Regions:
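DNA major-groove recognition helix of helix-turn-helix/homeodomain DNA-binding modules
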Residues: 49-71
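Sensory/regulatory domains in signal-transduction proteins
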Residues: 83-185
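Short alpha-helical DNA-recognition segment
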Residues: 23-41
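Residue-level detection of the helix-turn-helix DNA-binding "recognition helix"
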Residues: 20, 34, 45-47
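Short, basic/aromatic recognition patches
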Residues: 67-84
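Key DNA-contacting residues within the recognition helix of helix-turn-helix
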Residues: 16, 30, 41-42, 51
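A short, Lys/Arg-rich alpha-helix, primarily the initiator
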Residues: 1-20
């Protein structure tokens, strides 16, 4: 798989939520992106797509970061869990935290994978589910329902995925960015 999803969801709703949480006016957001205020409005309304450069700027702005004590507590809960689970940025799929059981499946040390996107290891079933998230309102709401699906398997030795039932739960972090808890059931 490539480093990023084949189907990149519009970032307008997330940008609007980020602006509201951080009390950023459209005019200031326009300055950050180097565009007109009306462009920000069209992005947020879903009327205009971002260019690749604008999207990269938005992804840097909206990417999940473990900034607060609560965010770090969530990462510690995942890292201390007996279950097979990991936490990724919902937007970039960068690995934020991982349980020992999940880390034991990897052929590289966890320290080498933390902060890197796991998308390249996605199975076709994971790609299909990622694409279907838009129709479920996954990116439009702060706390959509969890989704469960069969993952299929990949042939990776670095991050092997064996066919199993998986649950994705989207969580909003303290800065308004979204993380995804990935659990093997």
């Amino acid at each position: 798989m490539s480093a990023s999803p084949l189907h990149a969801p519009p970032l307008g709703p997330q940008l609007k939520r980020w602006r509201a949480l951080h009390r950023v006016k459209q005019s200031h957001a326009a300055e950050l992106f180097g565009v007109a205020q009306s462009t920000i409005s069209r992005w947020e309304a879903g009327l205009q797509q971002m260019s690749p450069g604008e999207r990269a700027t938005a992804e840097r702005l909206l990417a999940a970061r473990l900034d607060s004590a609560g965010d770090h507590a969530l990462a510690r809960l995942v890292a201390g869990s007996a279950g097979r689970m990991h936490l990724v940025c919902d937007l970039t799929h960068r690995l934020l935290a991982c349980s020992p059981a999940r880390a034991a499946e990897f052929s590289q040390p966890l320290s080498m994978l933390l902060g890197t996107s796991l998308w390249r290891y996605a199975t076709p079933a994971i790609v299909r589910m990622e694409t279907a998230l838009d129709t479920l309102g996954w990116h439009d709401r702060a706390g959509p329902p969890s989704v469960e699906f069969d993952t299929g398997a990949n042939a990776s030795r670095v991050v092997p995925i064996r066919g199993s039932l998986c649950r994705w739960t989207r969580m909003t972090l303290s800065d308004g960015s979204a993380a995804r808890l990935v659990e093997t059931l």
